[in-house]
């Protein structure tokens, strides 16, 4: 089998590419980073290093890459030959990926699975809609399968730019009925994906974001330093207790099952062999304060059902306080707040009502 994976970054190489390669799939990465593309085509291999005490290392072999900006015809041909097409580029870039993908899928005569591996709810649907806007209806042998992905891959540098450090834990869940052909090892196939996507997003991503925003507020620079601060861990647990209420109510996980999941996630955040800059975790504040994202979606549910939501209210306020002049979304956030105020910002970007916006603003003013 052959796969084309859009995004040769750390997630692409250290998670999706590794799993595909472990299934004896020939992986071709597509990226615009010339240094990464050239290195992949020179070495045809790289190391994935686990963030455990032994630094367990595996070598991913037989890979190559295409510079999608410089060689679109080669990418088009690779897409025509692919059995699997995956992405890990960030959900905001999926419409751009669709422009490369659409002509090949329109022309393609053989079955293919298309899977967007992004930190977003039903990201493959987002990609599919962008493709169909270009192509119109596609034949039945083009299979779009939603997925949920979970693996912490920190910002890092290595002597070999291809090598990547990842946490030992990973989870890749895919819609079973949308997938065509043999199921791959190390991927969990389920009938209903949404509980897994939302549980991950509202636990891992909500928690990670809280650590970033509260951590910076309390003067920390890394996830490990922040989670070692009792104030941050206490606030994190309050937030995850609240999102757990949403998850249990919506999807029927038992209280014990969700509590065990939360403890596992907090344990991952505390991994002494793995830390990350808060600026990498915190960036993209406009997306992360969105109405369907990790903070506002559970907060709105709890607010509307008159359930405890003080932790999430604080998380939203910490996000509003967050500073990073290298992140364009945070710069835009700060400019909008300065010109229009907190309530106007929350109405525009979080799309919440005035009363909940006032609650968040009150906490913001007390910080």
UniProtKB/Swiss-Prot annotation:
<dbReference type="Pfam" id="PF08125">
    <property type="entry name" value="Mannitol_dh_C"/>
</dbReference>
<dbReference type="Pfam" id="PF01232">
    <property type="entry name" value="Mannitol_dh"/>
</dbReference>
<feature type="binding site">
    <location>
        <begin position="3"/>
        <end position="14"/>
    </location>
    <ligand>
        <name>NAD(+)</name>
    </ligand>
</feature>
<keyword id="KW-0560">Oxidoreductase</keyword>
<dbReference type="InterPro" id="IPR036291">
    <property type="entry name" value="NAD(P)-bd_dom_sf"/>
</dbReference>
<dbReference type="InterPro" id="IPR008927">
    <property type="entry name" value="6-PGluconate_DH-like_C_sf"/>
</dbReference>
<keyword id="KW-0520">NAD</keyword>
<protein>
    <recommendedName>
        <fullName>Mannitol-1-phosphate 5-dehydrogenase</fullName>
        <ecNumber>1.1.1.17</ecNumber>
    </recommendedName>
</protein>
<dbReference type="InterPro" id="IPR013131">
    <property type="entry name" value="Mannitol_DH_N"/>
</dbReference>
<dbReference type="GO" id="GO:0005829">
    <property type="term" value="C:cytosol"/>
</dbReference>
<dbReference type="InterPro" id="IPR023028">
    <property type="entry name" value="Mannitol_1_phos_5_DH"/>
</dbReference>
<dbReference type="InterPro" id="IPR013328">
    <property type="entry name" value="6PGD_dom2"/>
</dbReference>
<dbReference type="InterPro" id="IPR000669">
    <property type="entry name" value="Mannitol_DH"/>
</dbReference>
<dbReference type="GO" id="GO:0008926">
    <property type="term" value="F:mannitol-1-phosphate 5-dehydrogenase activity"/>
</dbReference>
<comment type="similarity">
    <text>Belongs to the mannitol dehydrogenase family.</text>
</comment>
<dbReference type="InterPro" id="IPR013118">
    <property type="entry name" value="Mannitol_DH_C"/>
</dbReference>
<dbReference type="InterPro" id="IPR023027">
    <property type="entry name" value="Mannitol_DH_CS"/>
</dbReference>
<dbReference type="GO" id="GO:0019592">
    <property type="term" value="P:mannitol catabolic process"/>
</dbReference>
């Amino acid at each position: 089998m052959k796969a084309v994976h859009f995004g040769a970054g750390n997630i692409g190489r250290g998670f999706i590419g590794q799993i595909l390669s472990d299934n004896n799939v020939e992986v071709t990465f597509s990226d615009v980073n010339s240094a990464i593309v050239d290195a992949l085509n020179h070495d045809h291999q790289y190391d994935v290093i686990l963030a455990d005490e032994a630094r367990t290392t595996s070598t991913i072999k037989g890979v190559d890459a295409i510079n999608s900006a410089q060689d679109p015809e080669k990418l088009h041909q690779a897409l025509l030959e692919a059995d699997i097409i995956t992405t890990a580029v960030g959900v905001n870039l999926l419409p751009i990926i669709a422009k490369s993908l659409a002509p090949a899928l329109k022309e393609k005569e053989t079955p293919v699975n298309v899977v967007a591996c992004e930190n977003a709810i039903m990201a493959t649907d987002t990609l599919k809609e962008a493709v169909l806007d270009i192509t119109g209806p596609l034949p039945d042998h083009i299979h779009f399968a939603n997925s949920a992905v979970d693996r912490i891959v920190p910002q890092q540098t290595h002597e070999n730019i291809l090598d990547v450090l990842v946490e030992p834990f990973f989870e890749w869940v895919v819609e079973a009925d949308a997938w065509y052909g043999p199921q791959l090892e190390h991927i969990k196939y389920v009938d209903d994906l949404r509980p897994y996507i939302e549980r991950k997003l509202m636990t891992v991503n909500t928690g990670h974001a809280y650590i970033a925003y509260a951590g910076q507020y309390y003067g920390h620079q890394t996830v490990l330093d922040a989670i070692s601060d009792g104030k941050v861990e206490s606030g994190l647990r309050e937030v995850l207790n609240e999102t757990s209420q949403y998850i249990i109510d919506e999807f029927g996980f038992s209280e014990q099952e969700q509590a065990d999941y939360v403890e596992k996630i907090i344990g991952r955040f505390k991994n002494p062999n793995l830390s990350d800059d808060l600026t990498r975790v915190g960036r993209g504040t406009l997306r992360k304060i969105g109405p369907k994202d990790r903070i506002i979606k559970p907060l709105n549910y709890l607010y509307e059902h008159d359930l405890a939501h003080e932790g999430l209210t604080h998380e939203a306020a910490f996000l509003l306080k967050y500073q990073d002049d290298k992140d364009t979304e945070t710069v835009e956030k700060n400019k909008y707040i300065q010109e229009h105020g907190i309530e106007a910002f929350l109405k525009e970007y979080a799309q919440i009502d005035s009363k909940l916006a006032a609650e968040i603003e009150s906490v913001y003013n007390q910080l």
